[in-house]
A protein has these predicted regions:
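Flexible beta-alpha connector loops of hexameric P-loop NTPases
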Residues: 300, 310-331, 363-378
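Glycine-rich phosphate-binding P-loop
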Residues: 242-274
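N-terminal accessory targeting/assembly segments
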Residues: 1-187, 191-196, 207
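Conserved P-loop NTPase nucleotide-binding/switch module
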Residues: 341-385, 389, 402-408, 412-429
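Carboxylate/His-rich catalytic cores and anion/metal-binding grooves
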Residues: 193-199, 203, 259, 266-297, ...
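Conserved P-loop NTPase
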Residues: 416-497
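N-terminal pre-Walker A segment at the start of P-loop NTPase domains
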Residues: 208-243, 278, 286-291, 295-302, ...
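Terminal-proximal interaction/regulatory segments of ATP-powered molecular machines
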Residues: 483-565
Length: 565
């Protein structure tokens, strides 16, 4: 390992040379209180920035071991340090001048959710901290401007590192509150199922968001207040006793007029699979971690999926036990989404009437009289919802504003009235007695077949170069194949999408062998990530700074939408 003075001398020697001379700076340098690694140097000033990392020994960083003695605390601590590093790094970005991306400093910009990221990691055995980020090495045209890089690495960066990665220099009370919040959130999450619940929304939560393009809380809105009949309490280690609405296992229907907050509540529950930062308003909105949003998805591909639980006897004779299509309809796509969610071991379905295929959700009595059951290939969801819970243990939360048929199978009915939830179960059930229940199938359907096995990606191995590109939060591409994730609505961050792309690529190249089923592949992949970290997905000499942990549910959703599976 070289000293920082070696780097300083090297920069002096390459000043004003051709830009490729920067390649000689790769390596690790001792800056006294931390180590700076130049992991990858960009090819020219207009290319993607250089990859750098900071490494601080645990004894120097000084964070209490009690702040990282569990996985969820490690994630909370690293998330907080990433936010601090981002704040300080943003202030010094582009202070050094030059052409192209000269002077740029960048690191992951965290959103409202607390996610495990490659941007910052901590070694639980010794407290060593690593932060991975990017920097644009300065140039005049395509000539090395080493004086400006010296300014970046020796003049600007050290203060940034000192003020954000050392316990003695940060706001310790704020960090303590972050760790305490993570403990409180974990306490609710681990006790949710044993209390017979699939979700919890604390009294006083702020559910509406600032706008359709912002996840920040809306100001001056009606705060959430649980109806008495659904109010439960948790004794938390730091917050103390907290009360709120506990949604029980089973079938829950959320109804109400338009604009009264039904979908806002469901959206909060969707993202309740993640922890949220203090001040978000959804800190104590906690959902079953396996919950899946189910919706129609016209045009998606489906590969060898058993949708016979919902669709049978197609007029073209197509096999629905192993169904394939490149252009699914609303009903077939939603049927596939349900079965694929079952395959991921999801215990909770979240469904909004607004984004569902009507013919998949319901067939009323008049339609059943006109079009006989044997003439209709679709078995609607309402006829399977009770079976899903009683036979498979899968609860459902459904938002409905126009169809009252779900009053019949629902165990719990909540009305959103001017953003306030009310328990109307008894009244709704009484009213439903005057309306006939749709007839149910006489026989239970066989279990869906989850033995889909796919071969290794030989078509990829033949490629001279494999390129994975993230297309925002909603898609990624592997070479020319785009995986559309617009309707996988529980992806919270673009860096999760990037991780999904690399996860699919790794699974296709290294795990799929024609023998392991898709769920086994996903389990093996998630176990590898848990053991080795997200960076294990990469065939790279350095750790990419832009990956965030996805759930198994989204990993399998990405696999299922890959048209070359």
């Amino acid at each position: 390992m070289k000293s920082s003075s070696n780097l300083k001398l090297l920069l002096k020697n390459i000043d004003r040379k051709g830009y490729p001379a920067y390649k000689s700076t790769q390596g690790t340098y001792d800056f006294g209180t931390y180590f700076l690694s130049i992991d990858h140097v960009q090819g020219d000033p207009f290319a993607s920035p250089s990859k750098l990392s900071i490494h601080v020994k645990g004894r120097s960083a000084g964070f209490p071991a009690s702040f990282y003695d569990t996985k969820y605390k490690q994630v909370a601590l690293c998330d907080h340090l990433t936010r601090l590093f981002y704040q300080t790094l943003s202030k010094i970005s582009f202070r050094a001048k030059g052409s192209g991306k000269s002077g740029l400093f960048s690191v992951s910009k965290c959103g409202q959710q607390v996610l495990e990221r490659t941007a910052c990691t901590i070694n639980p055995s010794n407290g060593d901290i690593s932060v991975h980020f990017e920097a644009g090495f300065p140039a005049n045209g395509r000539t090395v401007n080493a004086r400006e890089l010296d300014k970046m690495l020796f003049g600007l960066l050290p203060d940034c590192v000192s003020s954000s990665l050392f316990y003695k220099n940060i706001n310790q009370k704020m960090l303590e509150s972050v760790i305490y919040l993570s403990e409180d959130q974990h306490t609710i999450r681990k006790n949710l199922s044993s209390m017979g619940l699939v979700a919890f929304i604390a009294d006083g939560s702020v559910l509406p968001r600032e706008s359709g393009i912002s996840q920040k809380p809306l100001r001056n809105c009606v705060k959430f207040q649980s109806p008495d009949t659904y109010r439960v309490s948790f004794d938390l280690p730091h917050h103390g006793t907290i009360t709120g609405m506990g949604i029980p296992k089973g079938i829950t229907l959320i109804v109400g007029g338009g604009y009264h907050g039904k979908s806002t509540l469901l959206k909060a529950l969707e993202l309740g699979v993640y922890d949220h930062v203090k001040g978000d308003g959804r800190e104590f909105v906690i959902t079953d971690p396996t919950a899946m949003k189910i919706r129609a998805e016209d045009g998606r591909s489906i590969t060898n999926t058993d949708i016979s639980m919902f669709i049978n006897n197609l007029p073209n004779g197509k096999n629905t036990v192993s169904f394939d299509t490149e252009d699914a309809s609303g009903s077939t796509s939603q049927a596939a989404n349900v079965v694929e969610a079952m395959e991921t071991d999801s215990s909770l379905f979240l469904i909004d009437e607004d984004t569902s295929a009507t013919n998949f959700m319901i067939r009323d009595e008049l339609m059943q009289r006109v079009v006989l059951r044997e003439q209709e290939p679709i078995t609607p969801f309402i006829e399977r919802i009770r079976e899903l819970y009683e036979r498979y243990g899968i609860s459902s939360i459904i938002v409905a504003g126009s169809c009252g048929s779900y009053f019949h199978p629902a165990d719990h009915i909540i009305q959103m009235d001017q953003y306030i939830p009310k328990d109307i179960t008894t009244a709704a059930k009484d009213a439903a007695k005057d309306f006939p229940m749709v007839s149910l199938p006489e026989k239970k359907h066989p279990d869906p077949c989850f033995d889909r096995c796919f071969n290794a990606g030989n078509h990829l191995k033949k490629e001279r170069k494999i390129k994975m590109k993230t297309l925002g939060k909603d898609a990624f591409s592997i070479n020319k194949d785009t995986v559309d994730l617009r309707y996988v609505e529980q992806i919270a961050d673009t860096e999760q999408t990037t991780a999904l792309g690399y996860a699919l690529l790794y699974a296709k190249l290294h795990l799929m062998d024609g023998k392991k089923d898709l769920c086994a592949v996903a389990d093996e992949l998630m176990q590898m990530i848990e053991t080795k970290g997200l960076s294990a997905l990469l065939d790279s000499k350095y750790v990419k700074s832009n990956l965030a942990m996805p759930r198994k549910q989204e990993v399998m959703a990405a696999m299922n939408r890959y048209r070359n599976l």
